[in-house]
Regions:
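Structural/interface elements that position substrates and couple domains in central-metabolism enzymes
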Residues: 2-70, 74-77, 83-138
Length: 138
């Protein structure tokens, strides 16, 4: 978990990203990160029961509502809520989970790793993209 090789692999290979907690409020970190993902060519699926659409993309309430294959589940939720999201990510067959900076759930991370998912925890996807992925998705 959190090894540079795993971070690079996720950035390079995970093209369809479900962003859990994505807000339409442009002042929220989830909005800025997801907007950047879109500009870099990633497909973003907003997951938030309080939103109908974000960036003109229809939002879904739960990961289980997504009808296509999800590569990465990027979690912008409180640490206490991350475990159930990780369990959903495992259930839908995601390749990886990313618990954003400040989101920590060691037990959930272990469950994901045990299920074969790549895991990054307590790191910012955007910062890591700038460090590890800028040359691959410019």
């Amino acid at each position: 978990m959190n090894e540079p090789e795993i971070i690079k692999q996720i950035i390079d290979e995970c093209k369809t990203i479900a962003v859990v907690g994505l807000s339409s409020n442009s002042f929220r970190p989830s909005n800025g990160v997801a907007n950047f993902m879109l500009k870099k060519g990633y497909k973003v699926i907003p997951v938030n029961p309080n939103e109908t659409e974000v960036f003109g993309i229809k939002a879904v309430a739960h990961l289980s509502d997504i009808t296509e294959k999800v590569d990465l589940v990027d979690i912008f939720r409180r640490s206490a809520e991350a475990g159930s999201v990780v369990d959903e990510a495992i259930e839908i067959g995601a390749k990886a989970v990313w618990l954003q900076e400040g989101v920590i759930d060691n037990a959930a991370a272990k469950r994901a790793e045990d299920a074969g998912l790549l895991v990054v925890m307590d790191r910012c996807w955007l910062k890591d993209f700038m460090k590890y992925g800028a040359e691959t998705r410019a």
